[in-house]
Amino acid sequence: VMTREDDVKFDSVRSPSVQKMRMAFDKDGNVTGMEQHVAAGWPTEVMAPYFMPKGEKDAPFDPFAINGANHWYTVGAHKVRAISNDLANATFRPGWLRSVGPGFTNWALESFIDEAAHKLKMDPVAFRLKLLTAEGANAGTAPNSVGGASRQANVVKIAAEKAGWGGQLPAGTGLGLATSFGQERDMTTWV
């Protein structure tokens, strides 16, 4: 068993990231497209570049720097762009200490979902549930992601109910909700 001290000596810190997101809506407020641009240090590029898969135009990319961008929300046309942060790569060796890519990717995504709900003047829980349709690719597959987006939607419903979502709050307080899944879509964890 590795202690936290051993872990800190063995691994490198997760890179900071900068993310830019945009969402398109039709005249009825339905989501028709989404872009997510993620600039971060690329651990695989620094440590083992020969393991990087090829993306568009045969350009290599580090999937560990954008894990989580292939989320369970139905957003129409979906574009994800991974940008290697050369400054981060040259300044320190980016790694996975204190979480892998979904740690920062899903934080940005969930914050953005709140912003989109606010723009549409929709309740953030209702907006999430509207996008977690479990249709097509978001239906999930056996044996790893059975239920897909419907399982994540169920987590949102249960969390909102247990938190008293929509109820009266004391003055000067607020309530937020975010959801996520494991490192990859085929992991069986929804939180």
Protein language model regions, located:
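Alpha-helical support elements that line or immediately flank enzyme active sites
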Residues: 1, 51-70, 96-132, 137-145, ...
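Short Pro/Gly-enriched beta-strand edge/turn motifs at strand-loop
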Residues: 2-7, 54, 58, 170-179
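Acidic, glycine-rich active-site loops and adjacent beta-strand->loop/helix elements
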Residues: 2-12, 38-42, 133-137, 181-183
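Active-site-adjacent elements of ketosynthase-type condensing enzymes
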Residues: 8-19, 151-153, 158
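Glycine-rich loop/linker segments at domain edges
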Residues: 16-111
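Generic secondary-structure signature for well-ordered alpha-helical cores
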Residues: 26-30, 36, 80, 114-122, ...
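Acyl-CoA/ACP chain-elongation machinery
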Residues: 147-149
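Non-catalytic terminal/interface segments that mediate subunit docking, oligomerization
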Residues: 167-191
